[in-house]
Amino acid sequence: FPPATGILAAFRQRKKQRFAFGRETLLQHLLFHAGTKEESRENALSTLSVHMKWPENFTRQVCRSLLKDGYITERNGLLLPTEQGKAHNLFYRENVRA
């Protein structure tokens, strides 16, 4: 199989897509619950994989990536969207998902 179109390339592409979608989904989840009475339960780092129904390892990878990019911050065990994260989410909703 040619490297750019083979089975391994398709697998890598699918994995990248799944991760990118996970980032957007988690950011949207955090924004949805930010400032609500459910925030302490829904945005808690300790229970996030349960709420998202994701494997723990995948949840950690997505969180690390969003933290590294400055889209979220961690405070007292809660993940909170930053202004940069809010702006990114708005851009994504207006331009990518349209």
Give, region by region, the residue ranges found by the protein language model:
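Short amphipathic alpha-helical interface segments
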Residues: Q17-W54
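Long, low-complexity, charged/polar intrinsically disordered regions in eukaryotic proteins
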Residues: F1-Q17
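Extended, hydrophobic interaction surfaces within ordered domains
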Residues: F1-P2, Q61, T73
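Short, amphipathic alpha-helical interaction segments positioned at domain boundaries
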Residues: E83-A98
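Short amphipathic alpha-helical interaction segments
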Residues: M52-K68
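A short, conserved structural fragment
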Residues: L67-G77
